[in-house]
Amino acid sequence: MIYGANASGKSNIVKALQTMKTIVISSAKKQRGDKLPITPFLLGNEDNKPTKFEIIFIQNDTKYQYGFILNSEKILEEWLLIFGESNRAQKWFERIYNEKEEKYNYSFGTKFLGSKQLWAENTRDNALFLSVAIQLNNEQLKPVFDFF
C-alpha cells in the first residue's frame, strides 16, 4: 500500500517498479543491440544519461538489496546483497562495466554458488546477470527473480 498527498510521486514509484520488473523479466530474451526500455526525463537534454534502479525487499524471510544502473544501450552496473541473521550485508555478485577496457568486471561473494563464469560469459551488454543466470537454471537466485 502506498500513501501520500496528491502530486507526491506515488504514480512515479509504481511506474519505476513496473519498469524494473519489465527489465528483470525480459532482458535475458533481448537480442544483441536491442534497446533497453528506459524513457529519459522528458524535460532533460541528456537522452542517454544513466538511470538507477534499486530495491530492498524481504522474500522468504530473507532481506535482499538488488539494483542496477543502465542507459538505453547497456547495463552499466548490477549488484545483489543478502542480509543474513546478523543483518550484515553479504555480496552475492557485483558487475561493473569498465569503459576503458570495454568489458565487465565481476566479483562474487563466497556464499554465491554455481556456474558463475558460465552465467557471466552468457550475459550480454543489454541483459541483467540475474535474468541470464535464471534462464540458465540458477536456483539460488530464484527467490530474487520471483519477487518481480
Language-model segment annotations:
Residues 1, 5, 11-66, 71-75:
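Conserved P-loop NTP-binding catalytic core
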Residues 65-148:
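Electropositive, glycine-dotted interaction segments
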